[in-house]
Regions:
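A generic structural signal for well-ordered alpha-helical segments
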Residues: 13-15, 79-80, 106, 138
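Short gly/ser/thr-rich secondary-structure transition/capping motifs
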Residues: 15-22, 95-97, 153-155
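Non-catalytic C-terminal accessory region of glycerolipid acyltransferases
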Residues: 2, 97-220
């Protein structure tokens, strides 16, 4: 209910200010578990995707966003909670598995979960190699993966910027990729191939230059 109320305020406001171009919304299933796998250019990405979809979307967010003090901390905590963000401690030794477990719980319950296979934001604009957690989730929960291409969000709030700016944004949703097509492969190969196909679909949507390597640079 809170998410719907926030959407009713933020969607008209964001559309009036940023006038985003949204393509392929029909590719997002209206019901049932689904993963939305996107490129990652900006802090604002986790707001752009939920505001462009026809249904609520959960994301992971640094636990720091939920622990701030004062009016600013309370506002940020309320906003992230209302947008369906799930706090995760990135410094925890078990952070990666906890993140996957949180996502698995959402999609097995029939929800939509947003994930960034690159692992962190791209500083140079290239599309980095995807990590196989997205494929593990899809195969484990037997849910489709909808590739998402974000264009222009890096101009709204680049890495290191504290305040958003006005810029054109495009959100593209590609056709769902279903895990059934990969089950004939050995588990490791299935995860790698599915992940590579998801990243190729994202690249086709964004036109980014493939980096060919993992993104090992922290964007914090």
């Amino acid at each position: 209910m809170v998410f719907r109320a926030v959407r009713q305020v933020l969607i008209p406001l964001s559309h009036a200010v940023y006038r985003p171009t949204i393509e392929g919304r029909e590719n997002v299933p209206r019901t049932g578990g689904v993963l939305l796998a996107s490129n990652h250019r900006s802090f604002i990405d986790s707001f752009a995707i939920p505001l462009a979809t026809p249904r609520p979307v959960n994301f992971l967010a640094k636990s720091d966003y939920f622990t701030g003090s004062g009016l600013g901390g309370a506002f940020r905590r309320s906003l992230f909670t209302a947008m369906g963000a799930i706090p995760v401690d990135r410094n925890s030794a078990s952070a990666a598995q906890e993140s996957l477990d949180a996502a698995l719980e959402v999609i097995k319950a029939g929800g939509a979960f947003g994930i960034y296979p690159e692992g962190t934001r791209s500083r140079d604009g290239r599309l980095y190699r995807g990590r196989t957690g997205v494929a593990w989730l899809a195969l484990e929960a037997d849910v489709p993966v909808v590739p998402v291409g974000l264009i222009g969000t890096q101009n709204i709030q680049p890495v290191g910027a504290s305040m958003p700016r006005i810029a054109e944004v495009t959100v593209k949703f590609g056709r769902p990729i279903h895990p059934e097509a990969y089950r004939h492969l050995p588990a490791g190969k299935a995860r790698r191939q599915l992940t590579d196909d998801v990243m190729a679909a994202i690249q086709a949507l964004t036109g980014q230059e493939p980096a060919g390597v993992y993104n090992e640079v922290s964007s914090r």
